[in-house]
Structures are given as structure tokens and as C-alpha cells.
């Protein structure tokens, strides 16, 4: 076979794959095994999220060539953090993607103090989208991985003052969650409570195409992902765990500064991601509603676990929209190992207290 025949065969094979591919919207309907209004809503919601991901991916691919993509705006957000230009752009993209959809009554983002209401949607929009528009935005300026995280909740109760108090519920109230990873390829991972599924954006088609279904995380993995630069700001239990993995073979450290990127690696390879509280921030840095709870939902669907140290993260009820929480998430055995060091320190503290009394 000459080179032209080989090329022709390769192109023909690619075309065959494209013809038989499963798109994101089709996959949602197939998994719900229904064309009911609710199923069509969920398919449309995921399609809109995919649209936002495509627009953000396109902007990121040209970040060094267009104005308004790199650097800071000079503003401080509700979290007390400097705002990156891509944070603002991505936040506005999600709003624009849903504004004319008729699907959601409001959007809640870590970039906005209060939920963004879409009055024309509220009579019929039955859902709320919660999201982190750009996770790891400090990586944008140096061309490293970043991501978007999303969660969908059913619209419940009333919110007369538009502060989103009815959203202060545990993670079990989510009906869907996922993330988009912007890297060498753009990957969308989602769950609607029926397993975890992976899609890759095919630029030639402009569609997210199914790459893996019913993904499960290994019960144990080699990777531990934590910012060891904060070592002396942690409680003793986390330092004990870190010393343990340093001294025992079979553990390797990977930390990129982007939660989505580190989570994605662990979801595929197994291991544990840790973002603990510190002396300065005892509740940690990650926002429960926009980051931790959506990823916990995914992890449990993949057969893993998510913990705050002594209790399941999915059980935590926030006391305000931007509440933070520590996060220990990953393979069941690796999360249990971290928890064992926390339990040991708790037991030691109780024994010391008993001796003093």
C-alpha cells in the first residue's frame, strides 16, 4: 500500500467514526431512556453548557493573540481575590449561553455575589446552574490547563430577595454535575446520576463526541495531589500523611494549580486530591457549591469518595452561597488512608484531654 492509499484509508476511517459518533445531547436522551419534557430539558441544558465550553476553549486557544484574555482587570471579586480577565469573559459566556434558553431561572457563580436572575425565563425555567467559570485562572497567562465546573439543581421554593438562600442545600440535591477541561484537547465530563461519561470536542465537527462511558476510578492509585508549599500551615494529621507518602514507595506527587486538571488525572489513574484547611483559612479555599460539591457528585458516581476529613462532603450544608470547605477526594482506599491520620490525631487529642482531667 502506498502513502496515498494509506492516507485515503485513514480519512475514510475517520469519516466512518464521525458518522457513527454519539454526541452529547443524544447521549443524555439515550441514558434517560426518555423523550419526556424533563429529559429534553436535561439534553438542552447539557448542550448549552457544551456551547459555553466551545466558546471558552476558542478564546483560550487564542489567549496570547487577542486583547482582554490575559492578566487582571484590577477589580476584586466577592471572594476577595483579584479578578482575571478570563474569569469575567467565561462568566459572561455562561450567562449569554443560557439567557435566551428558557431553561434556567438563574445562574450562580463564584464570580457573582448574588445569583444572576433571568426574569423572562423564571415562569418556565425549572433549573439553577451553579458554576465556576474558570478554575485555575492563574494558569491562563502561562498556557497551562484550566477548567470550568458546573452543577445543576432543580428550582425549589422561592427566593424573594434574590439572595439564593434556597440553594443552601447539601450535595445530594444536585441532579447533574460535571466539568470541562481545556488542555491539549477540550474534554467534557458529566453525570446525571447514571454513571460518569467523557466527551472530547472534535473541532472538525464542532461537537462533543463520546470517548468513554461509565468511567470508574481505581480503588487505589499512585497519585497524591496537594500543594506542599502550605505544609507548615496544615494541621498535624495532614503533615503526618505527607510524611507517610514520602517514606513509602508507590506514591507520586502531581499538582498543577488547577483543580479540574488534577481531579481529571486522579479520576483516570486513581489516587487522592487534597485541599485542606490552613491556619489562615481553616475552611480551606474551595467553594462548596461551585467546586467541591459538583466534583464530589462526579466522584461518587465513579465509585470514589469525597470527604472533609471526618464526614462525607456531600452531606455538608453551606451557610452562605460562597461557603468554603476542605476537600479530600479520590479513590476509596486513598481517601480512607488520609482519614485514618485525621482519626489518629483526634484519638490522641482525646486521650491527652482525658489524662489532664
From Swiss-Prot:
Residues given in the record as substrate binding sites: 135-138, 227, 255, 285
Q: Which UniProt keywords apply?
A: Calvin cycle, Carbohydrate metabolism, Cytoplasm, Hydrolase, Magnesium, Metal-binding
User: Which processes are annotated in GO (biological process)?
Assistant: fructose 1,6-bisphosphate metabolic process; fructose 6-phosphate metabolic process; fructose metabolic process; gluconeogenesis; reductive pentose-phosphate cycle; sucrose biosynthetic process
Which cofactors does this protein require? Mg(2+)
Q: What is this protein identified as?
A: Fructose-1,6-bisphosphatase class 1 1
- Give the signal peptide as a residue range, or say none if absent: none
Residues where Mg(2+) 1 binds: 110, 132, 134
